[in-house]
Regions:
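ALDH superfamily catalytic-core signature
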Residues: 174, 210-352, 414, 462-463, ...
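Conserved C-terminal structural/oligomerization subdomain of aldehyde/semialdehyde dehydrogenase
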Residues: 9-18, 199, 335, 342-470
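A short hydrophobic/small-residue beta-strand
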Residues: 150-152, 329, 411
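Residue-level signal for inorganic ion chemistry
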Residues: 13, 46, 68, 90, ...
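Structural signal for hydrophobic packing residues in well-ordered secondary-structure cores
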Residues: 35, 39, 54-61, 65, ...
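Short, well-ordered beta-strand elements within core beta-sheets of diverse protein domains
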Residues: 16-19, 33-40, 126, 236-239, ...
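Rossmann-like NAD(P) dinucleotide-binding subdomain of oxidoreductase/dehydrogenase enzymes
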Residues: 104-246, 371
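N-terminal Rossmann-like NAD(P)+-binding subdomain of aldehyde/semialdehyde dehydrogenases
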Residues: 1-113
Length: 470
């Protein structure tokens, strides 16, 4: 019997989907055979095909959102916003392609001309995460296909049904099946795809642990493009603000949206000493009002479960680890059912903890640090190997100027949540958060390589120095 991959609903434990495990060699070979024909198509044809893809997703939005909600456990309202992002990615990518990789002509001497054009890499592997199993891999796939590449997509083994649905939408829209391939499988399939000699590069969104392993694996393969979008141990700093309730709302949105399963979620709250007591009390009160429930519950939940029981187990272990290191509980991490991965929002003070761990606890856990001056706040915010997102809540513009100049992160926000990033801008981080290949609007940059050509319609040449007389 062929090996199968099963997907279960986090909120119920029920079996949702099953499929045989795919063959990496077959999928890469198919993409290798088909990509040249796709690349040879005019860019206008590829744009029109991808716009049909957006329309296909729009037409299937209800079924798609329902599937995402059931497979990830996120609330249905949030799954619907993910569908909106999938649809919007096409027009955003078309604009980015035109702006960043369009043909350009440069002035040249002696009647020649210089042109800058771009070529696709060939076959690109895409490894997707489970937290946004449609939107995030789609953010690699749309610009890759637009540039003329073929794609071999392996969704997370935790959300394979969503990945399969996404690929079905591409095929239904007219993207050639040989140019949009799907690999169903677990970590072994992902490793085999990453190491396959038939790919020309890999585009990844996921954990720092996996990203670092990929970075090592590609270290002696400079001929292959590698774009890494990893996690963050993101700080949110609250300083000099009279509106404590609004600050608390922004902190809760930053830390607990998507049950904390966003790479840009706030993991650390750094708060001015004078604001500590009222702010922490306001956050604690608001966190206690958040509805944690299943995707289709009524009233609608603010957040659902984390992705599965092993993830919940790991978060509980991580919270206990903070306690044993000297953390002080503000709000306990509560698991309402030991057989399901529902967790309540949790807060823990780590101000007096020596050797605070620099780890991304990918769930609804917020660590709180009391700072006595703004320099200490920035120093604490930068006390991480990651560098994805950071936010300052303050009514003082001069403080934001200092914060922006001093913080090391790829997304730096002011009076906005850490997990807010515009789609028409680059998205990425430094340190363990990425390898300086930002995605979103700048994904066009890693999906094609520039070619510079000096051109003249007639050959003209002369050597004026260094020749003996004839």
């Amino acid at each position: 019997m062929a090996e199968e991959l099963l997907s279960h609903e986090p909120a119920t434990g029920a079996l949702l989907w099953r499929s045989p495990v795919g063959d990496v060699d077959e999928e890469v070979a198919a993409a290798r055979a088909g990509w040249a024909g796709w690349a040879a198509r005019p860019v206008a044809f590829r744009i029109e095909t991808l716009r049909r893809f957006a329309n296909t997703v729009r037409a299937r939005a209800d079924a798609f959102a329902d599937l995402i909600a059931r497979e990830t456990g996120k609330p249905l309202w949030e799954a619907k916003t993910e569908i909106d992002s999938v649809v919007a990615k096409v027009d955003i990518s078309v604009s980015a392609y035109a702006e960043r990789t369009a043909q350009r002509r440069l002035d040249s001497p002696m009647g020649a001309r210089t042109s800058v054009r771009h070529k696709p890499h060939g076959v690109l592997a895409v490894l997707g995460p489970y937290n946004f199993p449609a939107h995030l891999p789609n953010g690699h796939t749309v610009p890759a296909l637009l540039a003329g590449n073929a794609v071999v997509f392996k969704p997370s083994e935790k959300t394979p049904a969503t990945g399969a649905f996404l690929v079905e939408c591409y095929h239904a829209a007219g993207v050639p099946a040989e140019c949009m391939r799907l690999v169903i499988g677990g970590p072994a399939a992902g490793k085999a795809l990453a190491e396959h000699p038939g790919i020309d590069g890999l585009l990844f969104t996921g954990s720092a642990r996996t990203g670092l392993a990929l970075n090592r694996a590609f270290a002696n393969k400079p001929e292959k493009i590698l774009a890494l979008e990893m996690g963050g141990n993101n700080p949110i700093v609250v300083w000099d603000t009279p509106d404590v309730d609004t600050a608390a709302t922004i902190v809760v949105q930053s830390a607990f949206t998507s049950a904390g399963q966003r790479c840009t979620a706030a993991r650390r709250l750094i708060v001015q000493d004078a604001l500590y007591d009222p702010l922490v009390a306001a956050i604690d009160k608001l966190a206690g009002r958040l509805i944690v429930g299943a995707p289709h519950d009524d009233p609608q939940p603010f957040m659902g479960p984390v992705i599965d029981n092993p993830a919940a187990d790991g978060l509980q272990d991580g919270f206990v680890g903070l306690l044993t290191r000297g953390g002080r509980v503000i709000r306990h991490l509560v698991r309402s059912d030991p057989d399901l991965p529902f967790l309540s929002p949790a807060m823990i003070d780590v101000t007096d903890m020596p050797d605070r761990p620099d780890a991304e606890l990918f769930g609804p856990i917020l660590q709180v640090f009391r700072a006595h001056d703004f320099d200490e706040a920035i120093e604490e915010a930068n006390a991480t190997r990651y560098g994805l997102a950071a936010s300052l809540i303050s009514q003082t513009p001069a403080l934001y100027d200092r914060f922006w100049a001093g913080i090391r992160a790829g997304v730096v926000n002011w009076n906005r949540p850490t997990n807010g990033a515009p789609s028409n801008a680059p998205f990425g981080g430094v340190g363990w958060s990425g390898n300086h290949r930002p995605s979103a609007y700048y994904a066009a940059d890693y999906c094609a390589y520039p070619v510079v050509s000096s051109e003249a319609e007639a050959a003209r040449a002369a050597i004026g120095i260094g020749l003996r007389d004839p």
